[in-house]
């Protein structure tokens, strides 16, 4: 299969899912998957429950899609499975921890996450991960890998994962845009046909800003669509061996969009007109530019799409993906900011 055909097929496969999600997920019914009864109330006899959310399922699925993409790209470079799994676990472990710690530091809230902050930590932690892999590879007679191709793989995988993972924000109603009424006339006309409207009192946009039922800038859908579109373009460059161009396109877009998109958001992201997240993104753009200019890239590196696909179709890889999704879902899927009150009864007509 040619690289262009693979890119086209993937894009066409994702498009219907994205278009459906942009219209369906802001509805009230797409927030809670299930509720688990945990404790029975003594006063009213009702059960109190913990909610399992689509937010967790979608965020885990987006992260998994990014991990699968990264696995495919490094497999196409000839990196053995043990090396790929090690880099995924190392970088993702740092990023997942940073997603909560950075959000707590910036927003002063315990029950929140920052994907943008996690991305910065991922970019910073990958060079040590590559150095560690190469050190082990020398001892084990495994292929060595240059830094820039791996950074390109990471940046592209992040964008593709972000495109799916951002759908979680549509389900929960977080990371939401400004009301159209707060925009200037020209900007309002631009966004009006695509405005997002969220429903349900347990959506974050409702309880944090009182904007349920109000048309807002579709910032989550815009981020998702652009991330997938730019990610696919950068993926094609990667598969064609243009690693520096792929890395710069994916990384600079992801970080630059973080800076720009915040001007259209209404949710709290810390104090100041230029938020801490925007500052981190700006520093990240400089870091990525310097890395692309001076980082090592073997000009003889070639990708083999068939080898990458073959690396995915392996029991060890498949079990790893299943375990990764389950762990991420458990970590993010149990709601700490919503609750449930449950009652049970016998259906007499079925007896």
What feature does the model see in each segment?
Residues 1-351:
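Hydrophobic, membrane-interfacing alpha helices
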